[in-house]
Amino acid sequence: MLSGCGTDMKKILTADGGKWEVDEGSSKSTYTFFDDGKFSVYDSKDNAAGKYSYDEKNKKITFDVSGRGTFIMEKVEYKDGKINGEINDRETVFVKEK
């Protein structure tokens, strides 16, 4: 078995340039996912980078942000061009950037 992202979710995350927007109420963040398991994120105040992995069995994306720690998106589901899940029990939606 390969480590890292599950094949289908990795293809979804990285397709068409790999850019996704997350609306966090007061700000929007843009995540960019790369084929090598790395990602970057930026918003109007900050930017960061790290590694991601997808646990297909448990439907979780783990984000390891360089120098800042790890957070997990649980209950991950891809539907209608969006990735829905929960981070710290808060609903989070990644929308494919056009």
Would you name each region that the model predicts?
Residues D23-F34, S40-V93:
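Contiguous, well-ordered beta-strand patches that form the walls/edges
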Residues C5-D8, D36-S40:
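Short, charged low-complexity linear motifs
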Residues E97-K98:
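Short, solvent-exposed mixed-charge patches
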Residues C5-E21:
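N-terminal helix-cap/turn-to-beta initiation motif at the start of protein domains
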